Amino acid sequence: MAKIINVIGREIMDSRGNPTVEAEVHLEGGFIGMAAAPSGASTGSREALELRDGDKSRYLGKGVLTAVANVNGPIRTALIGKDATAQAELDQIMIDLDGTENKDKLGANAILAVSLAAAKAAAAFKGMPLYAHIAELNGTPGQYAMPVPMMNILNGGEHADNNVDIQEFMVQPVGAKNFREALRMGAEIFHTLKKVLHGKGLSTSVGDEGGFAPNLSSNADALAVIKEAVELAGYKLGTDVTLALDCAASEFYKDGKYDLAGEGKVFDSNGFSDFLKSLTEQYPIVSIEDGLDESDWDGWAYQTQIMGDKIQLVGDDLFVTNTKILTRGIENGIANSILIKFNQIGSLTETLAAIRMAKAAGYTAVISHRSGETEDATIADLAVGTAAGQIKTGSLCRSDRVAKYNQLLRIEEQLGEKAPYRGLKEIKGQA
């Protein structure tokens, strides 16, 4: 038995200079797992609660000492003596101990950090890599895939201080033979984009996730400069590289309208979907995330109707990694893909349940970081261990993003042909 003998919580810093929760789980025999909770900027209203202290005299109210105390107090007491390999049982103990719908008593940041640390400790106890342990927890032992990265190389919206409304413009190196080559392609495009922007006299400062954040006149301009960079880097857009958008549309949804302030345009629900469809006809955009507000379910039905057969429509704020909400989406034919963020739901077990439900319904699952990250690379192991096929973990700079890419390089080196890189086949509507 992988007996838990100690649980430790502490306050550490995330990539935006805000506190977050780190946890350690110690087992008999000296096995230790350590993990940290990430934090989002554009958040869905139905996400599990990230517990902050609210003490304005400390970290401007963003301290997490209350959540840390919950780790070191009630969570530790409840888990001492339990078996770390029984992940579902551990997570349920913490969920029951919290007793709320959105984990606002103990904090999703406290529960998640312990949940992931326990998984890492259990993997160490079993003498296997974390991705292999996750595959076993998922009921798919030995079934792996290297994910196609969605690389956020140009930022707008909540992730940058500029006049671009769409939050993320991403490249996907779908023509690569393996993940290592995909990473190289993305890096070359990233550096070429810097030269293109510099040549136009535009800013090459970066946003929260490492993408550039220049002041462009429109969202179409953002796509145009990326196209230029891809081609200058020696790649063919639409064959070697495809494009993906994260609109984060909830951030500019006001009074039932989509207000693109940067463009000086206001759309109704169907009008904005038509606008996005027109972009997919001009550029090889194969994936659109949060193309409408999380509450605009009628609009989502229309968007899915006009694009769902050819474009991957990813629900992030829409589904918040929650199986109850995803069930409603599946039953109503809303979207065709789900973004998976650990901290939206708050435990590894619930995260795996959302991935399994999506796959069973023919939806894709895209594993994702948050804008506030740490050096913790657990999502890399999650992507491979569930054979999710796609990952979003930022641009090709900032060590909090690159840590995940480097872990994927190590995993690919270990697994070789056991973890194929399937490129375009992983993306809904493109197989």
Swiss-Prot record:
<keyword id="KW-0324">Glycolysis</keyword>
<dbReference type="Pfam" id="PF00113">
    <property type="entry name" value="Enolase_C"/>
</dbReference>
<keyword id="KW-0963">Cytoplasm</keyword>
<comment type="pathway">
    <text>Carbohydrate degradation; glycolysis; pyruvate from D-glyceraldehyde 3-phosphate: step 4/5.</text>
</comment>
<comment type="similarity">
    <text>Belongs to the enolase family.</text>
</comment>
<dbReference type="GO" id="GO:0006096">
    <property type="term" value="P:glycolytic process"/>
</dbReference>
<protein>
    <recommendedName>
        <fullName>Enolase</fullName>
        <ecNumber>4.2.1.11</ecNumber>
    </recommendedName>
</protein>
<dbReference type="InterPro" id="IPR020809">
    <property type="entry name" value="Enolase_CS"/>
</dbReference>
<dbReference type="GO" id="GO:0005576">
    <property type="term" value="C:extracellular region"/>
</dbReference>
<dbReference type="GO" id="GO:0004634">
    <property type="term" value="F:phosphopyruvate hydratase activity"/>
</dbReference>
<keyword id="KW-0456">Lyase</keyword>
<dbReference type="InterPro" id="IPR000941">
    <property type="entry name" value="Enolase"/>
</dbReference>
<dbReference type="GO" id="GO:0000287">
    <property type="term" value="F:magnesium ion binding"/>
</dbReference>
<dbReference type="Pfam" id="PF03952">
    <property type="entry name" value="Enolase_N"/>
</dbReference>
<dbReference type="GO" id="GO:0000015">
    <property type="term" value="C:phosphopyruvate hydratase complex"/>
</dbReference>
<keyword id="KW-0460">Magnesium</keyword>
<feature type="binding site">
    <location>
        <position position="316"/>
    </location>
    <ligand>
        <name>Mg(2+)</name>
    </ligand>
</feature>
<dbReference type="InterPro" id="IPR020810">
    <property type="entry name" value="Enolase_C"/>
</dbReference>
<dbReference type="InterPro" id="IPR020811">
    <property type="entry name" value="Enolase_N"/>
</dbReference>
<comment type="function">
    <text>Catalyzes the reversible conversion of 2-phosphoglycerate (2-PG) into phosphoenolpyruvate (PEP). It is essential for the degradation of carbohydrates via glycolysis.</text>
</comment>
<feature type="binding site">
    <location>
        <position position="167"/>
    </location>
    <ligand>
        <name>(2R)-2-phosphoglycerate</name>
    </ligand>
</feature>
<keyword id="KW-0479">Metal-binding</keyword>
<feature type="active site" description="Proton donor">
    <location>
        <position position="209"/>
    </location>
</feature>
<feature type="binding site">
    <location>
        <position position="289"/>
    </location>
    <ligand>
        <name>Mg(2+)</name>
    </ligand>
</feature>
<feature type="binding site">
    <location>
        <position position="392"/>
    </location>
    <ligand>
        <name>(2R)-2-phosphoglycerate</name>
    </ligand>
</feature>
<feature type="binding site">
    <location>
        <position position="371"/>
    </location>
    <ligand>
        <name>(2R)-2-phosphoglycerate</name>
    </ligand>
</feature>
<dbReference type="InterPro" id="IPR036849">
    <property type="entry name" value="Enolase-like_C_sf"/>
</dbReference>
<keyword id="KW-0964">Secreted</keyword>
<feature type="binding site">
    <location>
        <position position="341"/>
    </location>
    <ligand>
        <name>(2R)-2-phosphoglycerate</name>
    </ligand>
</feature>
<dbReference type="GO" id="GO:0009986">
    <property type="term" value="C:cell surface"/>
</dbReference>
<feature type="binding site">
    <location>
        <position position="246"/>
    </location>
    <ligand>
        <name>Mg(2+)</name>
    </ligand>
</feature>
<feature type="binding site">
    <location>
        <position position="370"/>
    </location>
    <ligand>
        <name>(2R)-2-phosphoglycerate</name>
    </ligand>
</feature>
<comment type="subunit">
    <text>Component of the RNA degradosome, a multiprotein complex involved in RNA processing and mRNA degradation.</text>
</comment>
<dbReference type="InterPro" id="IPR029017">
    <property type="entry name" value="Enolase-like_N"/>
</dbReference>
<feature type="active site" description="Proton acceptor">
    <location>
        <position position="341"/>
    </location>
</feature>
